């Protein structure tokens, strides 16, 4: 099975402006995708609202994957997302992910917990801001 990973998915969603939001989402997430971030569930539409909001704030960044595990349809990782915002400020979030992959290799469900490593108090909810 060919499968996506968090680095490819987040890079396409946040940093690859050659892809529309829908193109990036369709590449990495199923139509019935759901996500739980720090205890708050979002369906695919709510998740895409969140990413659309981030695209208005973010000018660049990178995703560093420190651990990553695939086991059949299960996926887990620990990564740090480094973001540079349009105002020049930076945010770094460490994220712990557990996910289910669909048979086609796209994310079907993600549950994640975030820890801000760098940024202002206003950025603490950047992982779920809409």
Predicted regions and their residues:
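A beta-strand edge to alpha-helix "cap/lid" segment located at domain peripheries
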Residues: 9, 15, 48, 52-130
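A short gly/proline-enriched turn/hairpin at secondary-structure junctions
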Residues: 31-43, 54-55
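Residue-level detector of alpha-helical secondary structure
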Residues: 24-28, 46-53
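Residues at or immediately preceding the N-termini of alpha-helices
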Residues: 21-22, 44, 104
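Short acidic-aromatic low-complexity motifs
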Residues: 1-32
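Short, hydrophobic secondary-structure boundary micro-motifs
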Residues: 22-23, 36-37, 63-64, 110
